[in-house]
C-alpha cells in the first residue's frame, strides 16, 4: 500500500514523499495533472473594434493565455462537455472588454468583465496591450472548459517527481566542495538525485550516490485556476475513470473472445 508524507504545502504548491508505489502509477498521476485537468480558458474572441497597434490575432492569443478561476464544483464534468451531454451554455462563459483611451493607458486582465463572478482572471494585473489617446478596444470573448492536451492555455498545473536519493559521504571535505550545488548533501528534499550526481562528479569515489526503489519526491504546483487539493482530487478522479474504462473494455474483449471459441 503506497504511503504519502506531505513535507511542504501551500494553497498552490505541494511536495510529498511517496513510498511503495510503482513508477508507472506515479508517472500516470504526473501526466494526468499536466495534460488532463479541466480548466476554463478563452477560446473564441469576437473583435468589434480594435484601433490599438496589436493585431486582432495576437490580442486573441494573449487573452487565451490569461489563467481563469475554474469552480469545478459548479461546472459540468469535462467529459459531459466534450461529449455534448451537457448544455453548451453551461460549459462556456462570456467576457466583455471595452476600453476607450483618453490618454496613455494599459489594458489589464482585470478589465475583462465576466458574466459569472466565479470565473474571472486569476491575476488582475496581467498587461494585455497599451493604448494612446483616441485608441479603443471593444470585444467579446468566450471561455470554455478544456484540457492541456488540446492547447497549453488549458494547463492547470505542473507536476514532477524524482527518485528519493540515498547519499553516503565518505569524506567530509566533499560537503564543502559541493556546498554551491547542495547545502545539505544528506537531505533528499534539498539535494535532488540530479544534484547529488553532480556532486559525485566533483568528489569522485568520496561520495556514493544511489536511490530508493519505489520511493519518490513528488511535487505539484497550480497556476491558480484552483488550489492544489482540487487539482489532486480531480486528477485521481480522472485516473480512476481511465482505469474503469480500461477494465470494462478488457472485460468486453475477453467475453467476445470466449463467445467466439464457443
Curated annotation (Swiss-Prot):
GO terms for cellular component: cytoplasm; DNA-directed RNA polymerase complex. Its EC number is 2.7.7.6. GO terms for molecular function: DNA binding; DNA-directed RNA polymerase activity; protein dimerization activity. It is an enzyme of class 2 (transferase). GO terms for biological process: DNA-templated transcription. InterPro entries: DNA-dir_RNA_pol_30-40kDasu_CS, DNA-dir_RNA_pol_insert, DNA-dir_RNA_pol_RpoA/D/Rpb3, RBP11-like, RNAP_Rpo3/Rpb3/RPAC1, RNApol_insert_sf, Rpo3/RPB3_RNA_Pol_subunit. Keywords: Cytoplasm, DNA-directed RNA polymerase, Nucleotidyltransferase, Transcription, Transferase. This is DNA-directed RNA polymerase subunit Rpo3. It comes from Pyrobaculum neutrophilum (strain DSM 2338 / JCM 9278 / NBRC 100436 / V24Sta) (Thermoproteus neutrophilus). The lineage of its organism: Archaea, Thermoproteota, Thermoprotei, Thermoproteales, Thermoproteaceae.
Amino acid at each position: 500500500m503506497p504511503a504519502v508524507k506531505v513535507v511542504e504545502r501551500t494553497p498552490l504548491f505541494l511536495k510529498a514523499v511517496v513510498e511503495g508505489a510503482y513508477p508507472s502509477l506515479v508517472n500516470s498521476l504526473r501526466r494526468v495533472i499536466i495534460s488532463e485537468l479541466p480548466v476554463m480558458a478563452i477560446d473564441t474572441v469576437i473583435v468589434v473594434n480594435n484601433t490599438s497597434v496589436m493585431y486582432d490575432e495576437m490580442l486573441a492569443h494573449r487573452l487565451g493565455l490569461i489563467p481563469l478561476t475554474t469552480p469545478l464544483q459548479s461546472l459540468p464534468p469535462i467529459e459531459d462537455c466534450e461529449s455534448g451531454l451537457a448544455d453548451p451554455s453551461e460549459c462556456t462563459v462570456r467576457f466583455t472588454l471595452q476600453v476607450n483611451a483618453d490618454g496613455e493607458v494599459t489594458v489589464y486582465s482585470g478589465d475583462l468583465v465576466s458574466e459569472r463572478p466565479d470565473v474571472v482572471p486569476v491575476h488582475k494585473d496581467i498587461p494585455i496591450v497599451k493604448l494612446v489617446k483616441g485608441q479603443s478596444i471593444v470585444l467579446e470573448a468566450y471561455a470554455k472548459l478544456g484540457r492541456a492536451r488540446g492547447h497549453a492555455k488549458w494547463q492547470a498545473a505542473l507536476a514532477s517527481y524524482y527518485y528519493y536519493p540515498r547519499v553516503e559521504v565518505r569524506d567530509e571535505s566533499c560537503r564543502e566542495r559541493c556546498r554551491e550545488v547542495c547545502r545539505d548533501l544528506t537531505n533528499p528534499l534539498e539535494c535532488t538525485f540530479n544534484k547529488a550526481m553532480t556532486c559525485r562528479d566533483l568528489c569522485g569515489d568520496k561520495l556514493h550516490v544511489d536511490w530508493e526503489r519505489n520511493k519518490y519526491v513528488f511535487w505539484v504546483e497550480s497556476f491558480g485556476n484552483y488550489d492544489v487539493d482540487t487539482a489532486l482530487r480531480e486528477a485521481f478522479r480522472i485516473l480512476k475513470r481511465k482505469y474503469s474504462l480500461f477494465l470494462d473494455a478488457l472485460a468486453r474483449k475477453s467475453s467476445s473472445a470466449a463467445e467466439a471459441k464457443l
